[in-house]
Structure formats: structure tokens, C-alpha cells
């Protein structure tokens, strides 16, 4: 199956891209999500605006105790640490597990976030890192927490004509600990469960998140509170917190296979976090 007819424009600057965007226009970065969906006619566009050559979308910089990563940075650039890593290995670890190398060479950080597939890596991993996103449109730039940007299944807070320009994440301290576990039935496919945890007392960061389980990645409130408080319970207290969190964010029956899968992934991620402590 092939995409419906559309016109193609390659933007030379971000301002040119913003002018070209409009009703029934789509922005193309790496094309690893948009093009397959257009070929399947799940989505369509009158105009496709190519952002792939815009160097300004690949720029990275420090902003105090946070780091800004351009939306055009590819998964492979993060995996190979061709940009500064503010996460003490967390982001390269996540990037290395995305699909296949050919996909990682083309796919971009921003493209994954805009696509907003709840089973994708970056929406879940960056939520656990306390990320904020920057978007730009005709009215200027605005920033918001990633949790607000992700509204639901393949739905974001982007307005018509806006472009995601980058992501801001905290620079983790030497006291930071993290774990990231993902379950796939075979290598390279989308996950059936993702369980990241990030804890950094110096940054006031303690987040446990569950991905590939609902309409969007969801914060696990009880486990996040335990991480933020520096508590490391085990046994019944831990399993009860995990069970209650999974049921709250998924609504699954406790006897079901998906519930057991998510619960197991969370407990393994917690155990891995303790090993790193």
C-alpha cells in the first residue's frame, strides 16, 4: 500500500518550516513513524515538510543544572554518545535498545515523542527523567512538562503548525541511580512492558514509570513516592505498592497475564535499582 498523493517541501530553516506548516501539513524528521503510517493510510497530508537537514534541531546545550537536547538528534547519536550525556548512561542505554540500528540511524528523539506511541521507548524513559519539552510556532516558543505534552494514545499538546524543537532533562549527579527494563517477545519489536526508575537525591528526583500498559506512559505514584523519600522497602510492602500502582494506572484484573507481566517488570526494575545503590 502506498501513501495518498502529497506535495513535498524541504525546509532550509526552522522559520521556513513554520511558514510551510499549516492545515493538513505534516513535519518529517526521520520518517520512521510518519511514513509507514502514511503508507498504510492511517494518516495523510497535503504537504510533507522535511526537517531532517535542519542543524538547529540537532543542537544541544547546558542550561544550568539541565541539558537541552535538540529534537532532531537521532537515536544512534545518543547511543554512540556523539552528544553530551547528562544522564550517567541512562539515555545511551535506552537508545541502544530501540528497534534496529537502521531505525536508530534515522529515527529522532523528537519524532518519537510527537508520534506518542505508549509502547515506544522515549515517551516512557523521558517521563521517568523528569523531562520538559520545547515547542515553537507562529506565536513563539513555549515549554511544558512531558507529562502534560503526552495527552493520550498518539495524541500530544502540539497545536497546528507547531514544531517540537527539543527536550530539557536534568543533569544527573554522581548520586543518581537508574534502571530501565523492557520486555519484548522478540528483539527489535515494540515493547509489551517498560519499567524505568530514576532516583537522584541531589536533584530531588524520584520517579517510577510504567510504559506499554495504557494510553500513555503512566507515573507509578506509590513507588515514586518511596523513591523520592529515599525509602527502599522489600517484601510485602513493596509488592503491595507495585500491585496497587499497576491496578491504578492500568485497570487490569490482578489475575490477568498483562498485570503479572507489568508487576514482574516493576519489581525487577526495583531490584536492579537497589543493586546500583
Language-model regions: role of each:
Residues 1-277:
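C-terminal structural segment of proteins
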Amino acid at each position: 500500500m502506498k501513501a495518498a498523493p502529497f506535495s513535498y517541501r524541504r525546509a532550509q530553516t526552522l522559520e521556513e518550516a513554520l511558514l510551510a506548516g499549516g492545515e493538513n501539513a505534516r513535519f518529517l524528521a526521520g520518517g520512521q513513524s510518519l511514513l509507514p503510517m502514511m503508507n498504510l493510510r492511517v494518516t495523510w497530508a497535503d504537504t510533507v515538510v522535511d526537517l531532517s537537514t535542519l542543524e538547529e534541531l540537532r543542537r544541544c546545550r547546558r542550561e544550568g543544572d539541565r541539558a537541552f537536547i535538540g529534537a532532531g538528534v537521532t537515536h544512534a547519536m545518543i547511543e554512540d554518545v556523539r552528544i553530551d550525556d547528562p544522564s550517567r548512561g541512562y539515555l545511551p542505554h535506552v537508545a541502544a535498545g530501540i528497534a534496529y540500528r537502521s531505525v536508530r540511524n534515522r529515527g529522532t528523539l523528537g519524532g518519537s515523542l510527537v508520534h506518542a506511541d505508549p509502547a515506544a521507548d522515549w515517551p516512557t524513559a523521558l517521563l521517568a527523567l523528569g523531562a520538559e519539552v520545547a515547542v515553537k510556532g507562529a506565536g513563539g516558543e513555549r515549554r511544558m512538562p512531558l507529562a502534560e505534552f503526552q495527552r493520550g494514545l498518539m495524541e500530544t499538546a502540539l497545536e497546528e503548525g507547531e514544531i517540537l524543537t527539543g527536550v530539557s532533562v536534568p543533569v544527573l549527579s554522581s548520586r543518581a541511580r537508574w534502571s530501565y527494563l523492557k520486555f519484548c517477545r522478540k528483539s527489535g519489536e515494540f515493547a509489551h512492558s517498560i519499567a524505568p526508575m530514576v532516583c537522584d537525591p541531589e536533584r530531588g528526583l524520584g520517579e517510577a514509570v510504567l510504559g506499554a500498559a495504557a494510553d500513555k506512559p503512566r507515573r507509578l505514584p506509590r513507588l515514586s513516592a518511596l523513591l523520592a523519600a529515599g525509602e527502599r522497602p522489600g517484601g510485602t510492602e513493596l509488592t503491595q505498592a507495585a500491585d496497587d500502582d499497576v491496578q491504578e494506572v492500568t485497570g487490569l484484573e490482578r489475575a490477568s497475564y498483562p498485570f503479572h507481566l507489568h508487576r514482574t517488570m516493576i519489581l525487577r526494575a526495583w531490584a536492579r535499582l537497589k543493586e546500583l545503590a
